[in-house]
Amino acid sequence: MLGQTHHFRTYAPEKIEYAINRYTKEAERLYKILDNRLSDHDFLADEYSIADIATFTWVRPRKMQGQNLDDYPNVKRWYDTIKVRPAISEGLSVLSDNMKWNAKPGSKEWENMFSASKK
């Protein structure tokens, strides 16, 4: 669901309000579930696991999903805990050198990402 949110909010060649609203609200619903789970757990599976690593990668671009961690205090605590772990921190530094958030893809990137010609 969060990938669809990214697509319709950031990448879609035409802005479709229904799709933007639908997936933004779905992202909000998922963040609420995550916040509830983390209200009495330090990590998603009680101990740090691949579930945390995988979910972290989807929470990181939250602005593209129309979400603010201030609205989800348990997710914010969890996110802040995960991002300073040595391997995560090292990975983020590699990404910061190679990735631009919200950059509009050119024709070649569009083809690679969506396997379709840009309109």
What is the predicted role of each segment?
Residues M1-H41, V59, K63-Q65, K100-K104:
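Conserved C-terminal alpha-helical bundle
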Residues L2-H6, F43-D71, K76-T81:
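GST superfamily/GST-like fold recognition
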Residues N36-E47, A87-G91:
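Surface-exposed helix-capping loop/turn segments at secondary-structure junctions
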Residues L95-K119:
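Acidic/histidine-enriched, glycine/proline-rich intrinsically disordered or flexible terminal extensions
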